[in-house]
Amino acid sequence: MNAPSPAPDEVSFGRSADGLLVALVGETAFAMAPARDGRHYLVTAWCISRPMAEWTRGDFYGHLGELADEAAFRSAVLENSEHQRERKMLGRVEEYSRAHTPWGASQGATVYADGVTSHSTARHGGFKLSADRNRKVHFLLRTKGGWYEEDVEWAIIAVTFPHLFTAFERRCAERTIKDSWPDAWEGIFGTILLPGESREKDRRAFEQAHAQDWIVVSAIRSKHKSGFVETVATRGAKRGPGTEVRRFLVLPDEYHVGRFGFVIDEARHQVYGGPSDFVGWR
């Protein structure tokens, strides 16, 4: 007979049958899974029926990003425990719904408050705000119809109605707005985002700084030039008809894509015009 699951805000840590550091928060299971190069990832599962000591890596299917070490794993699990505790206190109500949404028929709704409803569909999902609620959204972020998709735009709801979300959700929402709509964030909050505080703003800076540089748009380990990565690059990573394209050879140890692409150093990286491993260049 299985032991009862801990309450949503209780945490249990242990080791799996294959030696992984694991944890349980309510019915959500977590594991610190090894990857290549000594890295680790936070993986999750739902409602594993066996005791913790019988879990294996194969039980986990969700992926929540990279972990630096065991301390980072424990911190992430405790953060989730706090998130679940706060979410329970918010009193969100699950309802049956077949409402029409931009992503198809609703398969269920979660009511956060009067006029703030989240819909799940077969393909996607998102929030619907009533007209009164939507008028409270800042005009720089407001959508005309009051629909906000679940991947990115949900964050607009969270920063507009922060009392309806957990601290974890609010932190994620702030990060999402800064990354996706830095101009709106700066305009609304009267601040300037510094390098590293907004992915979109950093991307623009990268593109401006490297507009005339050769940036790799495709790469493959070369069979014709052993010990090199064959790359295809264009100025500023531009694509489309009429774009000048060149190939360069790069040592594998040097080739790291980075956040926005690999910039060719013409003083170090050799222009290549020989046989290619790319289809269309042969």
PLM regions with names:
Residues 1-21:
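Short Lys/Arg-enriched alpha/beta "domain-start" segment
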Residues 3-6, 25-29, 35-49, 58:
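Extended, charge-biased low-complexity segments
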Residues 48-50, 118-142, 238-248:
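A short, structured beta-strand/loop element
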Residues 54-69, 141-149:
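A short, exposed loop/beta-hairpin motif centered on an aromatic-Gly-Thr core
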Residues 61-71, 151-196, 249-282:
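Short, compact, well-ordered microdomains
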Residues 67-108, 189-215:
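Surface-exposed beta-loop interaction hotspot
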Residues 109-110, 117-121, 135-144, 171-198:
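A solvent-exposed interaction/effector surface
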Residues 206-282:
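Eukaryotic intrinsically disordered, low-complexity regions
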